[in-house]
Amino acid sequence: MENLLQQLISLDQSLLLSLNGSQSLYWDEVMSLITTTWISIPLFIALIYAIAHSSTPRYFLATVLAIGLVILVCDQVASGICKPLFQRLRPTHDPAIMHLVDIVDGYRGGRYGFISSHASNTFGLCVFLSRLFRHRGLTLMLILWASLSTYSRIYLGVHYPGDILYGALVGILSGYLLHRLLLWAGRRWNLFPPHRTASFRCTPSGYRVADVKMVIITLLLTYASILVWAALGIGR
């Protein structure tokens, strides 16, 4: 058992070193931007608008509360339980590997990294919102958003791939269960929005397709802005 654990740790370290960093200042800047929370603010604003536009006030409040619970549960499981429990050092703090890790602008993150809060939060929201809107295009964009956000943590050297994998699994389970809770609450207290008329094209769950497309465009424009911003930021 101890042998197997050591093999898994060695594999995790090898994967990290093969995926971490690059020789490009441009991609250093791109990943430094993608990893920040504030870069997703336009996406969250667009999502809130899309939810509000197709919901009754009660259902809107219930949905926002459920989204808040996704973030709270994922963050507390990752940072409040797993990190202090397992105390696995981040690659940037691990004496066995820290001198081999490519870091950007001196950023090393906190002391412990298992499991990744970024992974649990982003994949939790990805699953919850995908099941909420039930629109294939938005689901693909949310998977891209969660994947890029979590890969940026490996690129910057602050998480092992294993931290990301288990964080994502916690997020996926949390997002799924909390969406089921929202559905139960909607049926229990009759919170669902009224049936949409044929005058609007809607997703199977009742959200306007035009609003969903607006969310997708917002995310695409955010990534386009990151690419331009990173190009302008080279050499700073």
Model feature map: region roles:
Residues 1-43, 78-108, 195, 232-236:
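N-terminal transmembrane-helix/juxtamembrane module of multi-pass inner/ER membrane proteins
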Residues 34-51, 65, 118-121, 141:
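Hydrophobic alpha-helical transmembrane segments
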Residues 42-51, 68-72, 214-230:
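Hydrophobic core of alpha-helical transmembrane segments in multi-pass integral membrane proteins
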Residues 46-52, 147, 169:
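Hydrophobic transmembrane alpha-helices of multi-pass, membrane-embedded glycosylation machinery
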Residues 48-52, 74, 78-87, 130, ...:
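Membrane-water interface at transmembrane helix exits
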Residues 48-77, 139:
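Interfacial segments of alpha-helical transmembrane regions
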Residues 65, 69-74, 78, 166-174, ...:
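Hydrophobic faces of alpha-helical transmembrane segments in multi-pass integral membrane proteins
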Residues 102-236:
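Membrane-embedded catalytic cores of phosphoryl/pyrophosphoryl-handling enzymes
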